[in-house]
Amino acid sequence: MSNDNRFIDNGDGTVTDTEKGLMWNKTDSMNDLKKWVNYQDSADYARSLNEKKMAGHDNWRLPTRDELSTIYDESWAIKDRFGKDIHIHECFAPGGGFSMIAEQVSGRMRTWVFNIRTGEYDQPDGLWTLAESARAVRTIPKVDDEK
């Protein structure tokens, strides 16, 4: 599958990654809430999408550490809230944050943050003092799995 066809804008506020079997919210918390979020806010953001049944689904969650980097490609660029390049596919909405929060590290009071300007991970101290953005995701069958 060519990289050009990997991400599909579903026209319902979601983007499907056909290679990884993931459906992403097209916007992030910065687009939707107009503010930075801490870990609790990001979990609440995903929960609110479930309560609204965003795009007809109620299994939205924060991405894992590994899932965070799957939407990053240095050759792609759209503008973040500050007019700087973030390296995600053009199917995603511009104007969002430049970092994404992952789900909490199991058994620890920490999380991963992925910078979509630089492609680098960080594991900052303090779940409740973070100031990042969140993007929700859900797992779907891969296109190849449906055949």
Where are these regions (language model features)?
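Residue-identity detector for threonine
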Residues: 14-18, 27, 64, 70, ...
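An exposed tryptophan-centered "aromatic clamp" motif
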Residues: 43, 47-57, 65-117
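Disulfide-stabilized, aromatic/cysteine-rich ligand-recognition loop
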Residues: 115-147
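Short, surface-exposed beta-strand-loop junctions and turns on beta-sheet-rich folds
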Residues: 30-32, 78, 120
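Extracellular adhesion/carbohydrate-recognition regions
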Residues: 1-55, 60, 131-137, 144
